[in-house]
């Protein structure tokens, strides 16, 4: 598979997010961009009016010998779960998926500034993974050491592993909280009560028109999105799809 076909096989919103999140950190790693302009901090955004920082913090991650493997895992999660959501749950409705990312990004930015978290890539990716896991909660996933469990538990397993191995876990908790907020407001509540609490702005539909068969709004996403349980496993411990359970 050549590079062009690989990229064209990724839905449009995921494609641009994935490309930015791989290229920009590499440019920073090799000194082509000044990383001092990339991170998120309350004082710089609010008091010094550097309003670009929530955006640069979304696509930049400090790649070092110590963080490089973790960055690769985040890029893999982004590719796998963002692609799955956009091409399955939001199939033909990339504008609705973009609105989900904007919703999550807005709240991740606020929480991360409050908690002095300088980069948004990890909590944003975890928020997307959380939504996928809730929509596909009965899918069986395989984790390290042969562990298998329903997808609904995957975000918490990742949180536990990172808390133990890296001494952190705050990034994952922010992602879980934001992902749950979106899932409840945009998917679960409308599915149970038939009332849309939020809806995608029309300008996003004009920017990325729905494909044939796509519908505007969020109502019914869970009913229409749940797939038959499938298997996932983690290559070398971290994730590719299996053909079945």
Curated annotation (Swiss-Prot):
InterPro entries the UniProt entry points to: DER1 (IPR007599), Rhomboid-like_sf (IPR035952)
Predominant subcellular localization, coarse grouping: endoplasmic reticulum
Membrane topology: Multi-pass membrane protein
Ranges per topology, Lumenal: 27-57, 122-166
Disruption phenotype: Worms exhibit coelomocyte uptake defective (cup) phenotypes. Coelomocytes are scavenger cells that continuously and non-specifically endocytose fluid from the pseudocoelom (body cavity). Endocytosis by coelomocytes is not essential for growth or survival.
Induction comment: By endoplasmic reticulum stress.
Transmembrane segments: 6-26, 58-78, 101-121, 167-187
Keywords, comma-separated and alphabetical: Endoplasmic reticulum, Membrane, Protein transport, Stress response, Transmembrane, Transmembrane helix, Transport
Residue span of region Disordered: 218-245
GO MF term (any one): signal recognition particle binding
Residue runs in coiled coils: none
One BP term from GO: ERAD pathway
Compositional bias annotation for Gly residues: 234-245
Known role: Specifically required for the degradation process of misfolded endoplasmic reticulum (ER) luminal proteins. Participates in the transfer of misfolded proteins from the ER to the cytosol, where they are destroyed by the proteasome in a ubiquitin-dependent manner.
Family per record: Belongs to the derlin family.
Name under which the protein is recorded: Derlin-1
Protein source organism: Caenorhabditis elegans
Upper classification of the organism: Eukaryota, Metazoa, Ecdysozoa, Nematoda, Chromadorea
């Amino acid at each position: 598979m050549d590079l062009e076909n690989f990229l064209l096989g990724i839905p449009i919103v995921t494609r641009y997010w994935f490309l930015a999140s791989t290229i920009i950190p590499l440019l920073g790693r090799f000194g082509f961009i000044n990383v001092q302009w990339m991170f998120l901090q309350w004082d710089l955004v609010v008091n010094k009016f550097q309003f670009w920082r929530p955006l640069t913090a979304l696509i930049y991650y400090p790649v070092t010998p110590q963080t490089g493997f973790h960055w690769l895992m985040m890029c893999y999660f982004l590719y796998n779960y963002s692609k799955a959501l956009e091409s399955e749950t939001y199939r033909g409705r990339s504008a609705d998926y973009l609105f989900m990312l904007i919703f999550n990004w807005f709240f991740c930015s606020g929480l991360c500034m409050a908690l002095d978290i300088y980069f948004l890539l990890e909590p944003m990716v975890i928020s997307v993974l959380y939504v996928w896991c809730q929509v596909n909660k009965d899918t069986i996933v395989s984790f390290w050491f042969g562990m298998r469990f329903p997808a609904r538990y995957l975000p918490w397993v990742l949180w536990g592993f990172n808390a133990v191995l890296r001494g952190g876990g705050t990034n994952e908790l922010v992602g879980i909280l934001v992902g749950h907020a979106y899932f409840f407001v945009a998917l679960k509540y409308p599915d149970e009560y038939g009332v849309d609490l939020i809806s995608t702005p029309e300008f996003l539909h004009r920017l990325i028109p729905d494909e044939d068969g796509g519908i505007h709004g969020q109502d019914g996403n869970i009913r229409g999105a749940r797939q038959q349980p499938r298997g996932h496993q983690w290559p070398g411990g971290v994730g590719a799809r299996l053909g079945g359970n």
